[in-house]
Amino acid sequence: METLAQHRQARSSAQKVRLIVDLIRGKKVPQALNILTYTNKKAAFLVKKVVESAVANAEHNDGADIDKLRIKKIFVNEGSTMKRMMPRAKGRADRILKRTSHITVIVSDR
């Protein structure tokens, strides 16, 4: 049984989150959570929350055994970008792009 969890508008760029996602793709859930716990990045914390949510969904909705679950699919898409201005010298302004991402995790017991 496949179970999905998403975190939309995560306040980290898709490029940064993909570095973490590539570490755990295809791994068993306990091993993936262990990797995420000891990875010292903000994106690892965000991905860990989504994986834990997918595991909780699988356990509650489908009655799945946590030890048999594995990360079947995990991907990151770009979210919307918040545009901000930073004042500069001589009345000019630079544009600041605060990027977001959509994190999707699908766990399966097969």
UniProtKB/Swiss-Prot annotation:
Gene Ontology biological-process entries: translation
Keyword Cell division found: no
Keywords associated with the record: Ribonucleoprotein, Ribosomal protein, RNA-binding, rRNA-binding
GO MF terms, alphabetically ordered: rRNA binding; structural constituent of ribosome
Domain of life of the native organism: Bacteria
InterPro entries, per the entry: Ribosomal_uL22, Ribosomal_uL22_bac/chlpt-type, Ribosomal_uL22_bac/org-type, Ribosomal_uL22_CS, Ribosomal_uL22_sf
Cellular-component GO terms for this entry: cytosolic large ribosomal subunit
Cited Pfam families: Ribosomal_L22
UniProt cross-references to HAMAP family, sorted A to Z: Ribosomal_uL22_B
Family: Belongs to the universal ribosomal protein uL22 family.
Function: This protein binds specifically to 23S rRNA; its binding is stimulated by other ribosomal proteins, e.g. L4, L17, and L20. It is important during the early stages of 50S assembly. It makes multiple contacts with different domains of the 23S rRNA in the assembled 50S subunit and ribosome.
Subunit structure: Part of the 50S ribosomal subunit.
Name by which UniProt lists this protein: Large ribosomal subunit protein uL22
